[in-house]
Amino acid sequence: MFRTLLKSKIHRASVTHCELNYEGSCAIDEDLLDAANLGENEQVHIWNINNGERFITYAIRAERGSRIISVNGSAARRAAVGDLVIIAAFAQVHEEYVAGFRPKLVFVDPDNRIKEERSTIPVQMP
């Protein structure tokens, strides 16, 4: 049996561009793609913290070091420049590998600079 697990996450990234007339996708600074182990054309889920929108698209490369997060195509209607988003991708993992599987979690500052990288999520406390 396979389980679907969180593979990659860029947490609280700031949307820098919304390009309605661009052919779909989400352009992500190549440094962030690498840090989060996201590949070009990989399916990503985007969760908009500001308005609650959740949608699926695919990642494309933005210039390395540009700190760009550009929501493109029809998805541009679901975000605005300055919105905070979580970008996530999932993997199908065979159950024998689940216990040892660790996601790549990337936390960024308001300017989309990497401030922390982790592979675990702390236990939520009351």
Swiss-Prot record:
Residues with PTM Pyruvic acid (Ser): S25
InterPro entries linked: Asp_de-COase-like_dom_sf (IPR009010), Asp_decarbox (IPR003190)
Enzyme class: lyase
Active site residues per record: S25, Y58
Localization of this protein: Cytoplasm
Secretion signal span: none
Catalysed reaction, written as an equation: L-aspartate + H(+) = beta-alanine + CO2
Lyase found in the keyword field: yes
GO biological process, one term: alanine biosynthetic process
GO cellular component, one term: cytosol
GO terms for MF: aspartate 1-decarboxylase activity
Pathway involvement of the protein, from the record: Cofactor biosynthesis; (R)-pantothenate biosynthesis; beta-alanine from L-aspartate: step 1/1
Record text on cofactor binding: Binds 1 pyruvoyl group covalently per subunit.
Cofactors: pyruvate
Assigned protein family: Belongs to the PanD family.
Task of the protein: Catalyzes the pyruvoyl-dependent decarboxylation of aspartate to produce beta-alanine.
HAMAP family according to UniProt: PanD
Descriptive protein name: Aspartate 1-decarboxylase 1
UniProt source species: Polaromonas sp. (strain JS666 / ATCC BAA-500)
